[in-house]
Amino acid sequence: LLSRRQRQMCIRDSIKIDTGMCRIGFQVTEESADIIAQIAKLPNIMIEGIFTHFARADELSKEPAFEQFDLFKRMIALVEARGVEIPIKHCSNSAGIVEIPECNMDMVRAGITLYGLWPSEEVDKSKISLKPVMSLHSRVAYVKELEPGRHISYGGTFTVEHHMRIATVPVGYGDGYSRGLSNKGWVLIKGKKAPICGRVCMDQFMVDVTDIPDVKIGDAVTLLGKDGDETITMEQLGELSGRFNYEFACLITPRVPRIYHKN
């Protein structure tokens, strides 16, 4: 038997409407509205929100987003016609917030813009000012001199063709730093670019510091962010590795310490 406290508990839930993402949610039909009305009558349940998700709001044409918005409003009308009033209605993701404020309704769901990043290259960047807030840093773990003929990292994909100074950075794909950056990406040390040499390992990768004077163990390494006049952006990392900025923001693993700064 349920206790008195359990009988008095109220579950607050939200109803998802599928208007075009074809992921999860009720379809926009009379039958779906009937089911939602039945849910609203269940004891100990309060429907506090109803929402949908834009599939193409980050595209140049906003017609698909407005088609979804119209479907969403139609579903709300069907539900309200059955006597169900849902207080919070929302559908705007980051692209919607920036470009179609008329769809913002009672609440919005900012995602990538919280990082100061753009949802896509098709979004009008003149509408809002964004500043990237996420950076990724490490320190030089080892420095060595290599002569011509040596091969660096797994598979020997980088061959030393002249005398080089190589620094090891203790970060790898185990931290979410993409292996796709092997022999393509670079980091910043003392405000200068240090190209990645060879494959990114699970926990380490190597960079060329031949032209950066006096690099030593413990020197700061910027993998994402600004150092002096140079900057590495999430978009650059994504383009080089065949990923996109959302993935890089999500793939940094829990073993990487987070430091949060106010203001």
Tell where the protein language model's regions lie, with residue ranges.
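Single conserved hydrophobic/aromatic residue that forms the stacking wall/gate
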Residues: 1-11
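Active-site loop/helix belt of alpha/beta enzymes
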Residues: 18-139, 143-147
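C-terminal accessory subdomain/extension
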Residues: 145-263
